[in-house]
Amino acid sequence: FSMFASLSIGYNHPYVLENKDRLTAAAINKPTNSDIYSPMMAEFVETMGRVAQPDYLPYSFYVSGGTLAVENGLKTAFDWKVRHNLAKGKGEKGSQVLHFKQCFHGRSGYTLSLTDSPDPRKVQYFPKFNWPRVTPPSMTFPLNENNLANIISLEEQSLNEIKNAI
């Protein structure tokens, strides 16, 4: 099951209904597959670059889904950080990911180590990395005096946990 972020748009949105044939063709050709290029993917990349991609970020990489986006982002960060540290003579460092508790980033490879599964039986026998996990400074609404004091306290706690982890 997926679509947590996009389900709010829904299947009955007028754009979806008006473009169902085009969207069906896109689904059949999977335009986000970066190994097989289609005219639809080329159109998408051109539109995304024109509308949403700033000039100072000249490259783009598309994957199918949030979990794989996080996974590929982590691999990119590991690669960059380790190379950066090697070039500075600091050795092969850069494979730790500091992250918040109570989070969900998916259930594939690296993301399992970042996700709190509500049912531990789903992932209990999967190998995971023991990466530093800190308290999230989550806001509670309405943002009244008590809730504001609580978020300030949680932010301080989170910063202290980050400092201790580093």
Predicted ranges, named:
Residues 1-2, 135:
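Short beta-strands and strand-loop turn motifs
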Residues 2-3, 64:
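Glycine/serine-rich anion-binding loops at beta->alpha junctions
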Residues 4-23, 34-47, 113-116:
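A structural motif shared across PLP-dependent enzymes of the aminotransferase-like
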Residues 6-7, 31, 59, 152:
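Short, flexible active-site loop motifs that bind/organize anionic cofactors or intermediates
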Residues 26-27:
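Short alpha-helical transmembrane segments in multi-pass integral membrane proteins
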Residues 31-33, 100:
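Generic beta-sheet signal
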Residues 46-166:
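PLP-dependent aspartate aminotransferase-fold enzymes
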